[in-house]
Structure formats: structure tokens, C-alpha cells
Amino acid sequence: MACCTATEAIRLPIEMSHQSEIIKGNEQIHSSKFFKDSKNGMFISFLSDDARTLYETFRRGSYESNNGPCLGWRDSVTSKYQWMTFNETLLKAKNFGCGLVNLGVRPHDLVGIYSSNRPEWTLFEQGAYCYSLVVVALYDTLGPDACAFIIKQTDMSTVIVEDDIKANMILDKAPHGLRRLITITDSIRSATITRAKNRGVDCFTFDEVERSGSKQDHPVVPPNPEDICTICYTSGTTGNPKGVTLTHQNVVAAMCAVLLQLGDQRPRYGDIMLSYLPLAHMLERCCENGIFYSGAAVGFSCGNIRNLTDDLRALKPTIMPAVPRLLNRVYDTLMSDLSGSPLRRLLYNTALKAKESELNRQIIRKNSIWDKLVFRKIQESFGGNLRLMIVGSAPLAGNVMTFMRCALSCIIVEGYGQTECTAPVSLTICGDSIPEHVGPPVACCCVKLVDVPEMEYFAIDNQGEVCVKGTNVFRGYYKDPERTAEVIDSFGWHHTGDVGMWLANGTLKIIDRRKHTFKLSQGEYIVPDKIEAIYVKSQYILQNFVYGESLKSGIVAIVVPDVDVLKSWAKENHIPGTLSVLCSHKKVKELILNDMLSWGKQNGLKSFEQVKDIYLHPDPFSIQNGLLTPMFKLKRPQIKNYFKPQLDDMYTHLP
């Protein structure tokens, strides 16, 4: 079928067969082709000399937009978006920062915020930078104990909270050093105010602090590039959370490197980005600050992920960050809809093939016959105006990536990064249609791979642990030199714990994890050792191996039952058979799975840390069968390979 309108292909910024430079030497260090000095081991720190801190980048954005719209919000899912201009935002932010100074907060103090995404988040952040304050974000999945630890470790005297519920959560375990709670909404109860006073904590509203700052001015104290702008706490491992210390230079370098690589597709005045991913994480923070720097606008979601489509239809964003969990849901919904209609599936497959052919020729448009017949509904569910999507936080399956590029008819780039690298390490090139890699290094860093002999990955084979050095790499974990030394070596390389490989075209592909910790598709970290240690408390379990994939949202386990306990239970319940027979019995599986989940709940495992399915295996892991080390530790890669059919089968049957 003929296309509606011919469209010119987008310009490829570099040669696709050679996407990164290799720095001279024998370490095979890869760097960006977008910054001419990268091949000499130098990295970008800024794009404009007058915009080297987040205080300055915001003001440059105000100039670029000519005081255009900056922050958008709506009060309900049925109302329209209303907007605050850059100048209005700057004034309110400065007044709020000044109000904090009136309360006794001083330059370089650490101030917390515990809130969902909303305009006040940005007003606080920019107000903090007016007086060189350090932003520390708290969030739900940290939990009360971790939040209390953070407040105590940072000597935090002031926390901005969204509402009465979050205020009380902070008060539940508030350290003695906490002096002030500032609530964004006016819904705080008098009982909460009394409770706070009994703990020596004063309560204020966001508006009160802003009004105070408008009446009593203080000269601004802008930060230097080397000053800390934020401490981003990550709960990715066992024990207390780690505070990733990031400077203004770190964040500006990271966002400028991404803007540089986006080239013709970078944000500009007139663009609108939907803010819905947590601002507590650096992916969203970098995206938003890059938008502001470009003079573009940010519209905030209403806060309920179930209403995301309503927000998208109302805002009609042109730019959107995304995570695999969201895109997987869109893909799975479509596949489910198509399963009952062979004719619709045929039409869809024909449309996808035609769009993919254009995609491979860098033709990206929304006006083909296939857009009108097949993909218009999906495009409109994202607002209809999307031109750029940035995917991060976890890997996206190749078939889902290709589908989204064809269906949304917009540029979709996929990045790889870590909080310790201020988010981006690498990013795919605009127009590269090949999925399942994460592109070349961005211009603020270089990347090398180092041997992981215990997993049989060697740099000489272009495989190994991903190590990063550059202006985006953090200075260390806050007040934690021991854990800092574990990940930053004496030469300044950050060891990510991820295992990657270089593809022939100079792009990076993440293939494994050196540490046992891994991420699920929704971005949550899993520590299998911790979960296994809880499950093995079950009387029915001799050994267990917890497994997950970064493209999946749940975990599964291989379980070796305790033969004596299980046979005793089977005898009492009149279930005959050998251990092998019992392992395949439905009631036995239900018994052990339910007991595991019960132990998990008793020991505080979160829902995403609980297994969704198990496979019972009669033979123990041992040194002799190659599944245990001489120190009787699990040989994870070997167990994964040994039980690959069973693991694949469990994931096939998960919802």
C-alpha cells in the first residue's frame, strides 16, 4: 500500500559502523565521538561558560525561552493544565530559598524533601541552589528506618514533606536533630502539629516559608561547580542506604553530554516534557534540568500512575522519559488484544513490517497510512505529539523497543547509567534502529571493560566489568569511605558491577551482573543472597537459588527440599512417592511456596522481593556437580545455565 507523504530521513550524526573512539593505549578505553577531545581522555563539563551550575542553567533557560512557560500542573484529572512562567518560577523559588534562610538554614546545609513530583519540588530545588543548599530526596521505598538513618547521617534539620501522612512517617522515627517540617499541602492536622512540637519539631507550610522570604530578602549565595548539589540515596544493597554525593559539575556535565549527543533532536523552546518518574532518582532530575536549560517546559502528572494516559492526553508532551515497565505494559496489552483476532494480527504485522522498513532507513513520521489505520490510537494515548523518548533504568527487550519506535513514530533512545555516574554512561544514537544495546559512551566520560575471571569474562574478548571515569562520576558515598573504596579504584575508575561487551560498531551491550544484586524491569533492586537467607529458614528447604531477569518484573527460585522433612510431611498427608515424585506434586509445591512467602513476610520482604514461582529439584547443589564453590557458595552463572529450561518455563507461565 502506498504511503501518504514522502518524508526526508533524519540525519545520522556519526557513522553507525563506528560509534565510539578508542583512546590510545592497551586498555581499549572507549570514548565519545561527539566531543573532539574525548579521544585524548578529556571530558565535557558544560556547553556554555555562563551555565556551569544548576543555578546558572535554569537562568539560561529563562533567557532562551524569553520568559516562556516553565512549570505546568492541574488540580484534577478533569481539569486543564495551568502554567507558571520562568520568571514566576525564579521569583517563587528565590523567595522560598530566602524563607529557608529566615528559618536558620545556612549555605551548604542539607535539606530534605519527601514528595511526589509537583511544581513545589522544582521551586524548592531552585530555591535551594540560590543559597548553595544541598538537596536530599526521600522516597517511599526507602522505608521509615532508612529515612531516619538519612536524616541522622546528614544532620538534616529541615525536611519538606508533601502532606500529613508523610509528615507523620518522618515523625515516627525522627532523630533528635530534626527541627522543622515544611508541608507542601495545607492538609496537616492539628494533632500532627502537636505531635511534632512534643518532639521539638516546628511545622510550617510551604506558602508560609515563601511569604516569609518575599518580605525579608537575603542576598543570593550561588554555588560553584565543585559544590555538592545533591546527595541521592540508593537502597540497592543490604544494610543502610548509600548517599551518592553529586556536585553541580557532575549533573551539568551529564545533562550537557546527553544534549550534545541528541544534536538536532535535543529539547528546545516549545517542547513540553511530562514529569512522572520519581524526582528522587537522577534519571528524572537530569531530564528535567536538561529541559529547563533548553528553555522548554515541564508538566507534572497528577501523581497516580493509573491516570498517566489522562495526563498524557491533557498535556500532549513532545518529550518523555520512560522505563521498560511502562512500555512492556503497552506492548503486552496490544498483544493480548490481538490474540483473539487473526485479521487484526495480520494487519498489525503488515503495518509493523512497513514501519520497521522505514525505521531502518531513518524515516520517522506519523503520516503514513499505517499510522492512520493501526498506530494512531497508541500515539494518541501518549498525547499525539511525542517526538523524543528517552528510555532508562533497566534494559528494554528488542522486540518491545522496535514495536515502540514503529508505533509511536518518534525518536526513542536507550541509555545505560548509574546514580554514581549521575545517570548517563552511554546512550544510543538518534536514528540507530538496532535494539538491545545501550550505545556509545556519552561525552562526559569514557568506559573500559576489566576482567571478571570468576565468571570467565575477559577484556581481551571485549567482555568484562564496566568501569567509568569522567566528569559525571560521583565523588564518593556520603560519610562512607569504606564503601567508596570498594567501587572507586586508585586511578579514579568507578567499577559499576555490571558486565558489558563491546559490539563491533563500538556500542556497549550489558550482558550480566558481577555482583549478585540485579534490577527488575521496574527499576527495583534485588539482593538474592538476602532473600535466600530468609527462605532457607523454612523447614522444608535445604537450598534455594533466587533468580531474576532485568526484562521481567518478578523473581523465581530453584528450591532443593529437605528430604527428611518433606517425606515426613508426605507420609502424614498420605502422599506416596520418591523425592523426585514429590517434587513434581502440585500440593508439595503449594506447601513450600506458601511457607517461603510466609517467611518472607515475617522478615519484611517487599512484594517485589517475594518469588512468584518455584521449581523443586530433588538433587542438592554440590561441589561435585559444579553448582557450589569449594567454600560452599552458590555458583550462580553455572546454576543459571544448568536450570535454564526450568527458569525459562517459569517465566513463560508468569502473568
Language-model segment annotations:
Residues 66-69, 183, 202-204, 211-233, ...:
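Conserved pre-ATP/AMP-binding loop-to-beta segment of ANL
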Residues 252-275, 279-372, 385, 407:
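Conserved AMP-binding/adenylation subdomain of ANL enzymes
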Residues 83-87, 229-255:
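Conserved AMP-binding A3 loop
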Residues 2-26, 103, 126, 130-211, ...:
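Structural core segment of the AMP-binding/adenylate-forming
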Residues 201-206, 318-321, 330-433, 446, ...:
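Gly/Ser/Thr-rich phosphate-binding loop
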Residues 46-50, 67, 71-126, 143-148, ...:
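Conserved AMP-binding/adenylate-forming core of the ANL superfamily
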Residues 78, 165-225, 334-377:
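ANL superfamily adenylate-forming
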Residues 455-461, 465-520:
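Conserved ATP-binding/catalytic segment of the ANL
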